[in-house]
Structure formats: structure tokens, C-alpha cells
Amino acid sequence: MNKRNKKVEKKELSRILIANRGEIALRAIQTIQEMGKESIAIYSIADKDAHYLNTASAKVCIGGAKSSESYLNIPAIISAAELFEADAIFPGYGFLSENQNFVEICSHHSLEFIGPSAKVMALMSDKSKAKSVMKEAGMPVIEGSEGLLKSYQEAEEIADKIGYPVIIKAAAGGGGRGMRVVEDKSKLKNLYLAAETEALSAFGDGSVYLEKFINKPKHIEVQILADKHGNVIHVGERDCSVQRRQQKLIEETPAVVLEEGVRERLLETAIKAAKYIGYVGAGTFEFLLDSNMKDFYFMEMNTRLQVEHTISEMVSGLNLIEWMIKIAQGEKLPKQESFSLKGHAIECRITAEDPKKFYPSPGKITEWIAPGGVNVRLDSHAHANYVVPTHYDSMIGKLIVWGENRERAIAKMKRALKEFKVEGIKTTIPFHLEMLENADFRQAKIHTKYLEENF
């Protein structure tokens, strides 16, 4: 499928606009400046007082507090890029990071989009098509419908054939929306219609497909980097099984449940698939790992940087954002054997939410004392007197630690969480401390439905 033939031209990017906000915008600003380049930060009215904006080479307000008026406002972002004579756009994650229309518009305005092509992005954003292509690439896929479902009757026929439980998924889906687990035939029709309706509302596309439901799986993903010369490397795997309603809360690397043979097969499969589709940039292949800890199945590919890329950086020593920029400039990746993955890293997503019910807790942070110590990292845009807005994601920071092994990493994370003091709003710090003491977590027995069943 890969038809990469044209000669790659190297070009130096000098001024990069960051089409995002918060901690990932700050992180991008830092890396861009370390590379000797200029950074342009965009912001909405709601973010006008954020301190991190002052660290950029330039900043520009692009619209109102609503995402649709600012961080999703393509004309405003392109205008800002042209006004400040940017030559590239870094998308981060969320917002427009996986919007193929945005990628095409960037190209039309001679702006380098730091990520994959619109064609590959479009291919992998359609979950049903992506599954078919990954099957062609040799990836194990879950049994289910071949393409999109045309009707409830077709769903019923396939479910009868492969057996219950099944799961109905939105083709354009993500974040658990447009997704329904069907335990038996009597519930299929109502849940099929509910998934269609939710998918249409969330994504403007009601298309759905059906798969066999894997009970109590682990969520394992592989981080890859691919350059414009056809080279692909992996930066290990991550275990993201601690999640609530498909939203990740704690991530770690390596996945200690994997036998070495299974790990090698997983990593090789991801590299082969990335080459097959001609991928360029940073990407993540997500898999469901069966409870036997041996069989894994392709779930989806995220054609962007992941929130949890940080733990892959901690064990590899690579700066993934720096490499995304280098790839966009036409540079070649290092050889796989030129770096090794060492130790164990854990990330806890700290959100402005009630730690028991996960209700949002926006408002003013009256006190902020960040943890420190060797191999403790906090990626955050928040600070004392920062007002957590109601308009965006509730994450206020990512606490990341590295240890020689998993036990040391857990101990370091516990100590760092206890040091971390945030007053004025509720946060999920107490939840993370509780999870780190959980016997099943310590034994790496957590599966994707664990929190819903036990908390």
C-alpha cells in the first residue's frame, strides 16, 4: 500500500504556531525554543491570563471562550499563522489534531502540518476502514462486521453468527462515545439505535460497526515514530488499562504483564502496519489484550501525539515533540538499536474533578505546591491563582515519575502525590493515591472495566 517514492527535501522550520492550549502548548513552546526556533501561542478569551502564554515568542487571541470560536476556529488559526509568518503548525492533541480538513487547509496555505498526511489521517479516522486496512497489514483484528452496518437487521445477523456479547462502535468515534455493549439479543435493537444517535450527535456521522466484545481486556498501545524516508521505530508499549468510561487515568510503561515473545510480536506488528500505510510522524496503535495475556487485537490508531507520550520519553530519553518537528523538516530517525528502553515510568492525569464521583470542579486555585525530586516531572500550565475554566478538558497537569523498576516507580509516585498540594478546587490526587495502594493495581491485574465494577 505504501507508495513513498519521491525524494524528500529537507527544510528548516523557523517559526511554529501551536494550535492548542494548556500543558501541551507549554510543552511545545519549551521544545521549540530549545531547538532555537520561534513559537507562536494562540489563546481564547478564557485563557487570556494564562502565564504560559508569556513564555512564547509571540501570542495572539483568536476568539471567544467556546472551542468552536477559538481552538476549533480554522480560519482564525490560519489567519494568525499568516499574520505572524509561521511556516508550520504543531497541533498537539484534541481540538484539530486529527482533522484531515485542517491538514489540507494548512497545505493550501503552505504551512507544514507537524503530523501525518490528510490521506492517512482520513483512513485511520474511519474505524471500520482502519480495521480492514490493518487486517491487510497483518494485524490481528476482532471478529465482526466487514465495514459499516447498513441496518439493525444486518447487525442482528452478524451478532447471531459470532455470538454475544458484542459491541457497537461509531465509525468516527473516540472517547467512548457512540459505543454500546450488547449482552444479549433482546437488547440489540435499542442499543444499536442509541449508538447511532449518539454517534450522529457527537461526530456528525451516525455510521456504526459491530465487533465481538472482549471481556475484561487490558488496553495496551504502541508508540511509533515514522519519518519521510520510510523509516519506522517504536518507543515501547504502554499499559493504559486504568480508565473510567474509556478515559485514561493512569498509564505506565513497560506493560509488565507481557511475556517477552508477546511484546516482540506486538512491537513488530505496529512497525509493519505503520510502514504499510506510509505513516509519517508520531502515532499510536491501540490494542485490546485478552485476559490470557497472549492474544492482542487492533482497536484503533491515534494519528497524533498522545497525552501519555511522556512516559515513553522517560524510559527512552527521546523528546517526542522534538522528533515530530525533525521529521517534519525531513530529517531521518535514529536507528532502533541506537537507544534502549530503561526502567519503569508512570503517569497520573491530575484533573479538576471530585475524586469520588468525578464531577467537574472548576474555579480558582488558591494554593499550588508542585512535587519535586529526582526523576519526577510535572507537565502543567496551572499555578496559584490560576482559574480552571469550564469550557475545556478538566486536566490541570500530568505527574510523571521514573524508577529502576515498577515497585520503585510506584513508591516515587506515591511520595510525589503526597507532596503535591492543590487548594481551592477538588482534584483527583486522592483517587490516584487510593489506586496506588490497590492490591490489584500493584499486581497489574487492572482491566479496562475495573473501575466501573469496583469503584
Residue spans for each PLM region:
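ATP-dependent carboxylate activation and anion-phosphoryl transfer catalytic cores
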Residues: 7-27, 31-34, 39, 59-60, ...
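N-terminal nucleotide-binding beta1-loop-alpha1 segment
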Residues: 170
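A short acidic, helix-capping loop that chelates divalent metal ions and anchors anionic groups
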Residues: 176-178
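Conserved beta3 strand of the protein kinase N-lobe
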Residues: 144-145
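Acidic/histidine-enriched active-site and ligand-binding environments that engage anionic O-linkages
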Residues: 158-167
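ATP-binding N-terminal substructure of ATP-dependent carboxylate-amine bond-forming enzymes
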Residues: 1-136, 149-157, 408
